[in-house]
Swiss-Prot record:
Function: Member of the two-component regulatory system YvfT/YvfU. Probably activates YvfU by phosphorylation.
UniProt-annotated location(s): Cell membrane
Listed Pfam families: DesK_N, HATPase_c, HisKA_3
Catalytic activity: ATP + protein L-histidine = ADP + protein N-phospho-L-histidine
Organism: Bacillus subtilis (strain 168)
Protein name per its UniProtKB record: Sensor histidine kinase YvfT
Keyword Transmembrane listed: yes
Main location: membrane
CDD domains linked to this entry: HATPase_UhpB-NarQ-NarX-like (cd16917)
EC class: transferase
Transmembrane region(s): 11-31, 39-59, 72-92, 110-130, 136-156
UniProt-listed Enzyme Commission number(s): 2.7.13.3
Amino acid sequence: MKKAISIFPKEFGFFPYIFLVYTIMPFLSLLKESGVKQGIGYGMLLLFVAAYRQLFCSVGKASFTYWLIVQMAVILMYSVFYNITYIYLGFFPANFVGYYKEKTNFNRAFCALIFILLFPCLYQFIANSVSLRELFSVLPFLVIMLISPFGIRSMFRRIELEAKLAQANEQIKELSKREERVRIARDLHDTLGHTLSLLTLKSQLIQRLAASDPERTKLEAKEMETSSRSALKQVRELVSDMRTVTITEELVNIQHILRAGNITFQYEGADDFSVISPVTQNIISMCMREAVTNIIKHSKATHCAITISQFADKMRIVIRDDGKGAPKEKMFGNGLWGMEERLMLIEGGLTVSDHNGTVVALTIPLIKKAE
């Protein structure tokens, strides 16, 4: 499959192409020139467009400054030796000056912008090529050109801060998960460690007394049952303290996630999952989230549909998309192994198929929530 040809980097979208419309004005103005001057003018216009393209391709690189100098030099030549109206091309470098993150580089580029905008005006006025009235008509546009670098720089700062904030939030989430794991591990050790050790000792004692002292064996077995019930109660109390996500909540989250990824969402099936235990709902929610994350990251899909069917003894969840599907050798990559491991905890199963997109089917035996 051939890759689509892109003149400008894809991350800038359609914006660079819009600015190219403004090069039509100098192109038409050069038609009034003749001979060598016209040829040089069109040559500089080609160089200007090439520099414009290279500026987008070299953002953050050392060559960015060189191409900006080329663009400014072309504008200076146009507005001094051709016509003052070419100064409107200053909107191009004014945009790129705002790309500088370092204050020193920004100030230098801004001073250069001031020079290429004001020097031609003074030169043409002293040479009596333009009137004071014509200069005043240009003044509002000069002000906009000189203000725009600050606006562009402020916008990029905000984008950078938002990216850092998002990264910090992800780190906070990860730290919260780690803290929760440590807390659970500590609670399990404190609440179950002693009980499980006691059960181990009693099981060893029962093995030795099974033949010689049946009555004592029955008593120890009864105590083991009591201890195991106590351990089960402790586990349930521990789980109840955990923040679990219900299937209904996760469906809402999935809708928001898919909408952010420009993927339409359709849901069919049950809307009441109250009979399903919180632990089972939490595991199902994590599996659904993993499947949807795979769709957004890998499928290039435009639509996702989830169907949940509840039967007397089991639940079936089908997650399908209209994306490119996945190769057979990668079917159980991209987090699907993790989903399968989670489902094993509740005796569930996972199947993945490729039918006009990827189809992920989860089957979970239903264990109703304890009253």
